[in-house]
Design a protein with these regions (language model features):
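The conserved 3'-phosphoadenosine-5'-phosphosulfate
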Residues: 22-34, 39, 49, 86-141
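Active-site rim elements
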Residues: 71-78, 94-99
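Short, positively charged, low-complexity/disordered linker segments
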Residues: 69-72, 84, 88
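A generic local structural motif
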Residues: 7-10, 84-86
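Short beta->alpha connector loops
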Residues: 3-7, 103
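PAPS-dependent sulfotransferase catalytic domain
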Residues: 8-76, 107-115
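Soluble or luminal CAZymes and related metallo-dependent hydrolases
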Residues: 1-4, 76-84
Length: 141
């Protein structure tokens, strides 16, 4: 599950002890670039968004503080990302955990979930442009 739900991975893993956990991974620098150009950029300027999105950003800023600490400090954010990955790997048993990068594609993901590999290309979604389009659509809610 994408952010912000991923900030509550420990609670969710405890409530669903038989659930399989997929840890989406990427380089810390590429993750920081992505989050700083999307979630953090939006949270730092919530008043420029439609009213329904503003409430979401207020919630998001609380989750960011809980999971990343000082969202203005790149080194602290990257350290939180690295600590998050290490904690998930140290906590979740190997039979419940798949560490997956989008570049790995369908095969390891489908094998882990016990489902057939689709005949469609692995999706590329959640881009910066898509992120901001979703926020703009909040005005239609």
């Amino acid at each position: 599950v994408d952010w912000p739900t991923a900030a509550f991975w420990q609670e969710l893993a405890g409530v669903y002890p038989d659930a399989k956990i997929i840890l989406s991974t990427r380089s810390p620098e590429s993750w920081y670039k992505s989050i700083s150009e999307t979630i953090l950029a939006a949270v730092w300027a919530p008043d420029k968004w439609p009213a329904p999105a503003v409430e979401w950003f207020r919630m998001a800023s609380k989750v960011i503080a809980r999971s990343l600490g000082d969202a203005q400090d790149k080194d602290a954010i990257i350290a939180a990302f690295t600590a998050h990955e290490a904690a998930v790997k140290a906590t979740i048993p190997a039979n419940r955990l798949l560490v997956h990068s989008a570049k790995d594609g369908w095969e390891p993901l489908c094998a882990f979930l016990g489902v057939p590999v689709p005949d469609t290309p692995y999706p590329r979604t959640n881009s910066k442009d898509e992120f901001f389009e979703h926020i703009k659509k909040a005005d239609d809610i």
